[in-house]
């Protein structure tokens, strides 16, 4: 397999996206990749991230490719899990305390910071509208995050998230209680459980 064929395979596996980091990890030089990008007419959509002309623009996926230390959370996680009726106006992420997220805030991303102990609690992955996989929190962690931040979101989004979770057939209630304890919203979660499940 030639290097061009190898890069074509990587581009296909990335749903039309490829990163300089992934290319150099495979032992392919940056000048060679630059020639490949020119010949395939790839568009540079972010520093080190290239997109083929036939790929759908996917802001969440590009943000993930540029920032491996973020987890999509809050309203973005609600959208990924189908727990809200409309797409959020901004992208919401969570980072670990100590992570410098200034560049994200400058891009209009809403950044939440948590301690390292709870950063990976409920970590999973989900598929964006355009078919790309990104890291996010599971439904239980997302519900707890929403309850914690209820004053910072509109009432309709909040109520829809609670209703969608509580009426959904697949709930992991023991995990929900663990998340609610870690995020200090256990009393609120138990109140909602009593209303919806009893």
What residue ranges belong to the model's regions?
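Nucleic-acid-binding surface
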Residues: 4-6, 10, 15-22, 26, ...
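Residues in the helix-turn-helix
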Residues: 32
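Glycine-centered, phosphate/nucleic-acid-interacting loop/turn motifs that mediate DNA/RNA or nucleotide
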Residues: 40
């Amino acid at each position: 397999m030639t290097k061009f064929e190898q890069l074509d395979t990587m581009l296909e596996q990335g749903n039309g996206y490829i990163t300089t980091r992934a290319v150099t990890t495979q032992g392919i030089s940056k000048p060679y990749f630059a020639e490949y990008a020119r010949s395939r007419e790839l568009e540079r959509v972010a520093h080190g991230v290239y997109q083929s002309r036939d790929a759908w623009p996917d802001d969440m996926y590009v943000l993930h490719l540029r920032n491996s230390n973020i987890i999509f959370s809050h309203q973005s996680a609600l959208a990924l899990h189908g727990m809200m009726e409309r797409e959020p106006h901004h992208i919401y992420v969570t980072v670990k305390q100590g992570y410098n997220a200034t560049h994200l805030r400058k891009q209009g991303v809403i950044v939440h910071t948590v301690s390292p102990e709870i950063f990976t609690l409920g970590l999973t992955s989900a598929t964006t509208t355009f078919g790309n996989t990104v890291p996010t929190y599971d439904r239980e962690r997302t519900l707890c995050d929403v309850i914690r931040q209820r004053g910072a979101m509109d009432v309709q989004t909040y109520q829809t998230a609670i209703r969608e979770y509580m009426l959904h057939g697949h709930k992991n209630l023991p995990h929900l209680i663990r998340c609610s304890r870690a995020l200090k919203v256990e009393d609120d979660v138990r109140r909602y459980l009593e209303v919806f499940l009893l």
